[in-house]
UniProtKB/Swiss-Prot annotation:
Its EC number is 5.3.1.4. Belongs to the arabinose isomerase family. GO terms for cellular component: cytosol. This is L-arabinose isomerase. It comes from Clostridium beijerinckii (strain ATCC 51743 / NCIMB 8052). InterPro entries: Ara_Isoase_C, AraA_central, AraA_N, AraA_N_sf, Fuc/Ara_isomerase_C, Fucose_isomerase_N/cen_sf, Lara_isomerase. The lineage of its organism: Bacteria, Bacillati, Bacillota, Clostridia, Eubacteriales. Mn(2+) binds at E300, E325, H342, H441.
Length: 489
């Protein structure tokens, strides 16, 4: 399993010297209490109280310390007292880590019988956070705003949700995609500007000939294949009719891929059925098992989906997230559904049933029958996300969907599949998706939601459009027009 660093988030409390050392000390003590309490909640990463920031030099220093600390994935700010926002300008303009503004206060209720000016000098978040909010808006800084008392479960839940895209953003500069072969010939949507992707997301996308992969596969030993076959037998059922030699070939491909990727620091990759010279099979089971271990993947050279999938794997902690393709429709006007699948490469973390390794012919690629995992997908709320290149910008398109149980069998189509109703409906959802230019490949997840993808898009600075139950096509069409105009500037 690919590991993600054990990141931390820095808590920085705003104040000023005006109130004197006793108030500053109390601000510090209260901040530590809040941080300790938040860390008792179910947060995926630890919060560390760093400082009470009281002047421009100290704010600038702590922001740059956060930039330079490899373990810091973002900062959380709160204005306990009033903190004049001009002091924050230098620090915030230089901050390169995600920012969450926690709008809370130490006391939960107004102490009607005892409230006095001493209390008000200490507890000024109601207007102190508004001052901080103004400078955030004036500087046009990407920031998440969470409102509520720090003891409320909803507050810690909102912070926890935001941490996932923040870590994915920070890890973005570690995402490297290896392309084995080029994009599928003449396909438009899987192409794109790899230089701009590195500038915008930090993703490094490199090309390798299939011969480089074949060379890595040739170095695989029978003992290594035996070991991986034993792992397959623990994780998956094996169709008794399946050719063991075909399964062993996929194990060889997987080991060759993993060795190649790990030796060079790649966490995502693509293949293309048009570029298989020297290989006996199109990678199927090999790709599925690697995705289950956290690697991003894109079919037919789709490097944008591969990198996005790796980012969403980070957000989801590896759970319930994988490559998807809109395969075919159930166009019943009363029950419009999308069957999602691919030739071979659907991640088993999306499965509702224990996957089965099967071997069947594949009428594409011109190679031997490949082994693949076959299963029916889980049910429940999910998202399908597509990243496309619009020429002058990237656009992230997110569709919230409702997955349903796959009750029918497909004896003549041995693929892994997921079945869902796109929001607001198949008719309206497909119209909106096509209107926005959404791809046929998506990164699909049960453990990432539209809010987290909106947060991530805000962090990286790309356009994001959402299709859900609130979508009205006339409004959505205008949103796309306005967005296209705005992003030209």
């Amino acid at each position: 399993m690919l590991k993600v660093k054990n990141y931390e988030f820095w808590f920085i409390t705003g104040s000023q010297h005006l109130y004197g050392p006793e108030v500053i000390e109390q601000v510090s003590d209260n901040s530590k209490i809040i941080v300790d309490e938040l860390n008792k909640k179910d947060l995926p990463y630890k919060i560390v109280f760093k400082t009470v920031a009281t002047d421009s030099p100290s704010i600038r220093k702590v922001c740059n310390d956060a930039n330079n600390d490899e373990n810091c994935a973002g900062i959380i700010t709160w204005m306990h007292t009033f903190s004049p926002a001009k002091m924050w300008i230098h620090g915030l303009t230089e901050l390169r880590k995600p920012l969450l503004h926690l709008h809370t206060q130490f006391n939960k209720e107004i102490p009607w019988g005892t409230i006095d000016m001493d209390f008000m000098n200490l507890n000024q978040a109601a207007h102190g956070d508004r001052e901080f909010g103004y400078i955030g808006a004036r500087l046009d800084i990407a920031r998440k705003i969470v409102v509520g008392h720090w003891t409320d479960a909803s507050v810690s839940a909102d912070i926890a949700k935001w941490m996932a895209p923040a870590v994915a953003f920070t890890e973005g500069h570690s995402i490297k995609v290896a392309r084995f072969g080029d994009n599928m010939r003449n396909v438009a949507v899987t192409d794109g500007d790899r230089i701009e992707a590195q500038i915008k997301f930090g993703w490094i996308v490199d090309y390798y000939g299939v011969g480089d992969l074949v060379k890595s596969m040739d170095a695989v030993t029978e003992d290594q294949i035996d070991e991986l076959m034993a792992e397959y037998s623990k994780l998956y059922d094996i169709d008794p009719k399946a050719s063991i030699d075909s399964i062993r070939e996929q194990a060889k491909i997987e080991i060759g891929l993993r060795t190649f990727l790990d030796a060079r620091g790649y966490t995502a990759f693509t293949t293309n059925f048009e570029a298989l010279h020297g290989m006996k099979q199109l990678p199927g089971l090999a790709v599925q098992h690697l995705m289950a271990e956290g690697y991003g993947f894109g079919a037919e050279g789709d490097w944008k989906t591969a990198a996005l999938l790796r980012a969403m794997k980070i957000m989801a902690s590896g759970k319930g997230t994988g490559l998807m393709e809109d395969y075919t429709y159930n166009m019943d006007s009363e029950n419009g559904l999308i069957l999602g699948a691919h030739m071979l490469e659907i991640c088993p973390t999306l499965a509702a049933t224990k996957p089965v390794i099967e071997v069947h012919p594949l009428g594409i690629g011109g190679k031997e029958d490949p082994a693949r995992l076959v299963f029916k997908g889980a049910s429940g709320p999910a998202v399908a996300a597509s990243l496309i290149d619009m020429g002058n910008r990237f656009r992230l398109i997110v569709n919230s969907v409702d997955c349903v149980e796959v009750t029918e069998d497909m004896p003549n189509l041995p693929v892994a599949s997921v079945l869902w109703k796109p929001q607001p409906s198949l008719k309206e959802g497909a119209k909106a998706w096509i209107m926005a230019g959404g791809a046929h490949h998506t990164s699909f997840s049960f453990y990432v939601d539209e809010e987290q993808l909106l947060d991530w898009a805000d962090m990286v600075g790309v356009e994001c459009v959402v299709i859900n139950n609130d979508t009205k096509l006339s409004t959505f069409k205008n949103e796309l027009k306005f967005s296209s105009t705005a992003w030209k500037f």
